UniProtKB/Swiss-Prot annotation:
It comes from the Bacteria. One of its GO terms (cellular component) is small ribosomal subunit. It comes from Flavobacterium psychrophilum (strain ATCC 49511 / DSM 21280 / CIP 103535 / JIP02/86). This is Small ribosomal subunit protein bS16. The gene is rpsP. Keywords: Ribonucleoprotein, Ribosomal protein.
Amino acid sequence: MSVKIRLQRHGKKGKPFYWVVAADARSKRDGKYLEKIGTYNPNTNPATVDLNLDAAVKWLHNGAQPTDTARAILSYKGALLKHHLDGGVRKGALTQDQADAKLATWIEAKSGKVDAKKEGLTKAQSDAKAKAFKAETVANEKRIATQTEAAKALEAVVEEATTEEVVETATEEANEEKEA
């Protein structure tokens, strides 16, 4: 029986969520599987991968062939590197301690890169938020300035109209006095 390590789709329409499973190559995409190895959530940025490294390496040792996307996920989490290093230990090129040390340094470097990306994304998001807030305050100041100018212009027009009325009434009264 040939075994594949592949993704099994779960989640809603438009919101995929995958299980990383070891399944018989002849079974359906979302059908029966032998073992659930982990999960993959592409909806987050960066994508969230939860993988049982030992189970994945066990299936790789047993000859399971990962699909392209599953291979990328296994590589991202270090399962392929561990499988490669275990091959070196079996051949006698490395000791188990050396292989574990190489894997640990690689995992630390990889987690540093992922953390840097997360920090960069949060920084970019906060910068965009601050820029939008600044643009909004500038727009509010302009709007308030135009409203005050319009209010002053309206006051001037009303004041001018009242002075004209006073002048008209004064001239009318003067005309009435002359006639009388």
